[in-house]
C-alpha cells in the first residue's frame, strides 16, 4: 500500500484536519474506555508540533444524519482531553458549526463536532466533502476503524484536498496486519469467536488459507460441532452453514471442542455444567469451553509464533462462563508470539483481564479489521493511494 505519509508532508503552519476515530463508548456522559483517544494522540501531537491550526473530527454513535443530538455530541471527548491530556496537547475547544469556515484562536486544538450531524456524510456527498476540504491544507486520515466506510469525511474528502495523507495510527494498523497476514512467522494461529459463522464467513475462509491452526469459539464453534454430527441442544448455531463448516474442516486444521460448559438457561447466574460434547441434552446450550478443550488450545498457543485474535470463545460476560476466554486471553498475553487482536468484544475481554500491554498490537478497528483480514480493499486507503498517484510523488512543494 503506497500512500503519502504524514511524516513526508511539510506541515509547518498549515491548516491540518485529522479524521480520527474518537467513537468511544460513553455511559451517562462518561467515557468508559478511552483506548481510541489515546491511540490517536501521536498523530495529534505530531500535527500540533508543526502547526497551531489543527482540527480533529470523528463520528460518534449512530445519530439521525443531519440532525444534532446531544447524546452523540463529541463534548465528552473534549472534556476528556481537557481533564486528562491538557499537558500533552494544550487548550481544546469544540466547534459545532464549521462547514462555512472557522474562527481561529491561536494554539487551540479544535474538535469539530460529530460528522454524522452533517447531511450527506454517510452517502459520501461530494458537496460536503468539498466543504471539509476547504477547511484545511492537509487532510490526515487516521481513523482505521472507519477505513471501510465510504463516507464524506473518510473517503471523498481525499479527492478534493491539496494533500491527503495517512496518519501514524493508520500506518501502524496496516503494518501490524501485514506482519500477521503477509509473511507470518510460523506456526500461525488464528482465533475467531463470536455468535455466527455467517458474520465471519469470509474471515474464516481467508484465514483458512494462511493459518496453521484456526481456532473457533462461541456460536461459531457450535456450527462446527453440528457439522460433525453432535447434538448442540438449544445452542445458537446455523444449520444452513453446516456444509460450509464441513468444507472448512477439510481444508484447514480446526481443533473442535471435545468438552464444553452448558446450562439450561442463558443468564448471568446460570449454573455451569461441564460435559463431553457427546452428552449435551436437547434443553441445554453451550456457553463456554470445557477444561480439556481449553488445554488443547493452550498447547497450540504455546507453540505459536504468530497469533491473530478476533472474538471470545464463550459468554465471558457471565462469570460462570468466563474461564475459556480468560485462559485463552492469558495464554496470548504470556506468549512470545507476535500477537494482534481486534474487534469490539475482543477489546472488552482485553480490558476485563487487563492484558492490553501484553498484546503486541491491539487494533482500534472492528469492521475494518475484519474486512482487511478478508482481503478486501478498504475504500479510505484506496482513495489515499489514488491521491498519491495523482500527485505523482510531487507533494512536498505544493503551494498551499
UniProtKB/Swiss-Prot annotation:
GO CC annotation: cytosol
Positions contributing to substrate binding: 21-23, 36, 59-62, 116, 149
Keywords assigned by UniProt, alphabetized: ATP-binding, Cytoplasm, Glycolysis, Kinase, Nucleotide-binding, Transferase
EC number: 2.7.2.3
Enzyme class: transferase
Annotated Pfam families: PGK (PF00162)
Catalytic reaction list: (2R)-3-phosphoglycerate + ATP = (2R)-3-phospho-glyceroyl phosphate + ADP
One GO BP: glycolytic process
A molecular function GO annotation: ATP binding
Subcellular location: Cytoplasm
InterPro entries: Phosphoglycerate_kinase (IPR001576), Phosphoglycerate_kinase_N (IPR015824), Phosphoglycerate_kinase_sf (IPR036043)
UniProt pathway: Carbohydrate degradation; glycolysis; pyruvate from D-glyceraldehyde 3-phosphate: step 2/5
Cystine bridges: none
Main location: cytoplasm
Keyword set includes NADP: no
Chain positions recorded as ATP binding sites: 200, 317, 343-346
The organism's place on the tree of life at top rank: Bacteria
Subunit structure of this chain's protein: Monomer.
Family to which this protein belongs: Belongs to the phosphoglycerate kinase family.
Family matches, as HAMAP family: Phosphoglyc_kinase
PANTHER family for this protein: PHOSPHOGLYCERATE KINASE, PHOSPHOGLYCERATE KINASE 1, CHLOROPLASTIC-RELATED
Protein name from the UniProt record: Phosphoglycerate kinase
Organism: Blochmanniella floridana
Lineage: Bacteria, Pseudomonadati, Pseudomonadota, Gammaproteobacteria, Enterobacterales
